[in-house]
From Swiss-Prot:
Gene3D superfamilies: Aldolase class I. It is found in: Cytoplasm. One of its GO terms (molecular function) is 3-deoxy-8-phosphooctulonate synthase activity. Disulfide bonds: none annotated. It comes from Citrobacter koseri (strain ATCC BAA-895 / CDC 4225-83 / SGSC4696). It holds the Pfam family DAHP_synth_1. It catalyses: D-arabinose 5-phosphate + phosphoenolpyruvate + H2O = 3-deoxy-alpha-D-manno-2-octulosonate-8-phosphate + phosphate. GO terms for cellular component: cytoplasm. This is 2-dehydro-3-deoxyphosphooctonate aldolase. Pathway: Carbohydrate biosynthesis; 3-deoxy-D-manno-octulosonate biosynthesis; 3-deoxy-D-manno-octulosonate from D-ribulose 5-phosphate: step 2/3; Bacterial outer membrane biogenesis; lipopolysaccharide biosynthesis. Keywords: Cytoplasm, Lipopolysaccharide biosynthesis, Transferase. Its EC number is 2.5.1.55.
Amino acid sequence: MKQKVVSIGDINVANDLPFVLFGGMNVLESRDLAMRICEHYVTVTQKLGIPYVFKASFDKANRSSIHSYRGPGLEEGMKIFQELKQTFGVKVITDVHEASQAQPVADVVDVIQLPAFLARQTDLVEAMAKTGAVINVKKPQFVSPGQMGNIVDKFHEGGNDKVILCDRGANFGYDNLVVDMLGFSVMKKVSGNSPVIFDVTHALQCRDPFGAASGGRRAQVTELARAGMAVGLAGLFIEAHPDPEHAKCDGPSALPLAKLEPFLKQIKAIDDLVKSFGELDTEH
């Protein structure tokens, strides 16, 4: 079955093409740290021949605690993204939380992301669609894979069909997430075979029910990423940090930056193998 291709400049994203890495840091902690992390990603992905898009948030508007670090904000965040693009020649993805942010952010970055908690907010979806930018839609933890078709339809009605879907797990009782591997193919089907990617970092979240920040299971990042990529996906979404224990957001789920290259070698090997098989129709 023909898979839809979404182009991010010269990077083509599709379920049957070599996977694209959407990777970086959870939130912009400082200009210098962003430069350091981006440079490492660029070096490793160029060495391994993996198409790459840098990821970071300029504002974490949905932190659990009012006391948690949110980021540098829109103006300073866009300055950092512009410098990263100019210095390393990378594409950039970041999330928006309000309709008023959509166009200013789309003027700077290459992909704008619809956060999972906001994925059904029609005014935000319409504002993002109007930018004409490539869109990455995070599947909410509380929405079934089949319901993602309705969100995609909103973007299409807004005149934008450059949509990528991203799974980051589903609620499993309170304060825990699991990944339904069967859901990836459902998301492909209901979206007209749009590219589907896997956010392995946030799928590893778990939390203390009375805590102020999410916990995580980064010790299991490799096995979960292997399983997801074995399905045959358009891309992998992952966050890394040189010192996860002291990251300002989601450190417990972040891959240690020093482990990025050996991790990606395994992921690329699995992706290459799975996509060498071709499609096998077992329904008929």
